Design a protein with these regions (language model features):
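Sec-dependent N-terminal signal peptides
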Residues: 5-14
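N-terminal signal peptide c-region/cleavage motif recognized by signal peptidases
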Residues: 15-19
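Short helix-initiation/N-cap motifs at beta->coil->alpha
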Residues: 27-29, 86-98, 135, 240-248
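Extracytoplasmic substrate-binding proteins
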Residues: 31, 118, 123-211, 293-348
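Structural recognition of the beta-strand scaffold that forms the well-ordered cores
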Residues: 42-44, 62-65, 107-111, 129-133, ...
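A short, structured surface patch at a secondary-structure boundary
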Residues: 43, 49-102, 107, 131-132, ...
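Alpha-helical, coiled-coil/dimerization segments enriched in small aliphatic residues
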Residues: 69, 222-243, 247
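Proline-aspartate-enriched helix->loop->beta-strand connector
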Residues: 89-92, 96-113, 127, 247-264
Length: 348
């Protein structure tokens, strides 16, 4: 009875809006009916928020997650200043339903691991919900898991990113922008692959991704693939699944040659360089502890700029002689001008 009521309620909304409706399948496999022309969206996932900005759909965002600055970095406000005035309506795992309804969004984007009760609360008031995972895997346990076990990580994230960008672009009526974003991402990625193809696995640089509180990424996340594509051997991949805390003794035993730290955790650089216990590690001894630029998003989920220019930056740090003829800064500026419509102003 409730299901029939909701379907009828949605039909009434579409009828009063005077719009035709389209049916989409989100990345959890859910069928979702959405207005033909979408001008008002709410976003409770930072990855989708970043994609909407690059698709030139920022003006359609009427509600946003409360901690988007923390998730995307303090400098992100420069890329999308309009977001500062957008009302907060929840976060990755919760929603302020009253605030959301007042904004009258035509669709709400959530993460694939958003609680089912959260999705139900939104859909029960007649607002369509689209879940985005940016990974595509046939195994059922991967769909709504924050630490998925993927049958084929490479294919899952490549196909998942393409599918996610295409889905979001189609929903917000930016299909051509989505196609161009996908093309640029994978065209740029091929440049790195060609230059690193002859490096044997046992000669790849040992690298470690350092996060606060001795957390790191092992296998099953895009972070590990990013390191792999850039020619690194992720020291945590063999024993760590997903995102987990490790001991300093474990890191010392791995003895990475290079340590990378995401731009949103700048304090970790000083912690590592100033702590006497870390000084026995090759990366620290040889001053190869790098704070990553904002575009090199070593997240659990893939982002197009991370694949296109982030992996290039990382590869150039690991193997500078192989990329000496490439102007990484110029490639970065070109990306920012094309997809963020501004100059890059961060560090390299």
């Amino acid at each position: 009875m409730m299901k029939k009521y909701l379907i009828g309620f949605i039909a009434v909304i579409f009828s009063f809006s005077g719009q035709a409706a389209r049916e989409f399948t989100d990345q959890l496999g859910r069928k979702v009916v959405i207005d033909d022309h979408v001008e008002r969206v709410a976003v409770l996932q930072h990855q989708t928020l970043n994609l909407l900005v690059q698709l030139d759909a920022t003006d359609k965002i009427v509600g946003v997650m409360g901690n988007w600055r923390e998730q995307l970095g303090q400098n992100y406000e420069r890329l999308a200043p309009e977001l500062v005035k957008v009302p907060n309506v929840g976060d990755l795992k919760s929603v302020n339903l009253e605030s959301l309804v007042q904004l009258k969004p035509q669709v709400v984007f959530v993460t694939n691991y958003a609680p089912q009760e959260m999705i139900d609360k939104i859909t029960q008031v007649g607002i369509p919900v689209v879940a985005i995972s940016l990974q595509k895997d046939n195994s059922s346990h991967a769909k709504n898991n924050v630490n998925p076990e993927l049958d084929n990580e490479e294919q899952a994230y490549n196909d998942g990113l393409k599918e996610g960008i295409t889905l979001i672009g189609d929903i917000v009526n930016k299909p051509d922008n989505a196609k161009e974003l996908i093309k640029q991402t994978f065209d740029s990625r091929d440049i790195v692959a060609r230059r690193l193809k002859d490096i044997p696995e046992n000669q790849r640089v040992r690298a470690y991704m350092a996060n606060p509180d001795l957390t790191t990424y092992g296998s099953g996340k895009y972070t590990g693939l990013m390191m792999q594509h850039a020619g690194a051997m992720n020291v945590a991949a063999a024993t760590i699944k997903g995102y987990k805390q490790v001991s300093l003794e474990q890191v010392i035993s791995w003895n990475p040659e290079v340590i990378f730290i995401q731009d949103r955790y700048p304090g970790v650089v000083a912690e590592i360089n100033n702590d006497p216990r870390w000084q026995v590690i090759d990366a620290v001894k040889n001053k190869r502890v790098y704070l990553m630029p904002e575009y090199a998003k070593a997240w659990g989920y893939p982002m197009p700029e991370a694949m296109a220019i982030g992996e290039l930056w990382m590869a150039a740090k690991l193997y500078p002689q192989k990329f000496a003829d490439i102007d990484v800064d110029a490639d970065v500026n070109n990306w920012y001008q094309k997809f963020y419509r501004t100059q890059y102003q961060g560090g390299h």
